A protein has these predicted regions:
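Amphipathic, Lys/Arg-enriched alpha-helical "gate/interface" segment within cytosolic domains
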Residues: 1-154
Length: 154
């Protein structure tokens, strides 16, 4: 499966970056050592919606580099309907225990109708997102099902 996605568009935010990648993937990356507040989450969601032009997308959150995220921002990301309704699936990439705890809390808070999964490897996260998109649109092949076994547990 192809895991390299060229950047189609990059939007710089005050405390992060939104990258539109091929394959309907939106990558949210945080800038180092900042506190991602509610206003930053609102700005990010508006930028995401604008980048995808209101069409379904796959969300890839790279939380390997970040300062912290406020409770208001976490709750906003979990419950805001602007992008939640068009998000096919979401993969969160982490590399620290605090980030894993934040991600697990976010998953419980969001009660998403769409799949959300935590990863430590960004390539695995992209492959999983690709599989979720194929599942949604009925394009899953037998080799994809074997591949899916790798991701049954977090």
């Amino acid at each position: 499966m192809k895991t390299q996605y060229p950047k189609l568009q990059t939007i710089e935010l005050e405390k992060g970056f939104i990258e539109l990648l091929e394959g309907n993937i939106i990558l949210l990356k945080f800038k180092e050592d900042g506190v991602f507040e509610l206003r930053d989450a609102i700005e990010a969601n508006k930028a995401i919606y604008s980048a995808v032009k209101g069409k379904p997308f796959l969300s890839l959150v790279d939380a390997r580099v970040y300062g912290s995220i406020s409770a208001g921002a976490r709750e906003f990301f979990a419950k805001d309907t602007l992008t939640k309704e068009i998000k096919i699936a979401e993969a969160i990439v982490i590399n620290t225990l605090p980030a894993r705890l934040y991600a697990k809390f976010y998953i419980r808070l969001s009660k998403s109708a769409n799949p959300v999964k935590i990863f430590s490897d960004i390539h695995d996260a992209k492959l999983w997102l690709q599989l979720q998109q194929k599942s949604m649109f009925g394009e899953v092949l037998e080799r994809d099902i074997r591949f899916h076994d790798k991701f049954k547990n977090n």
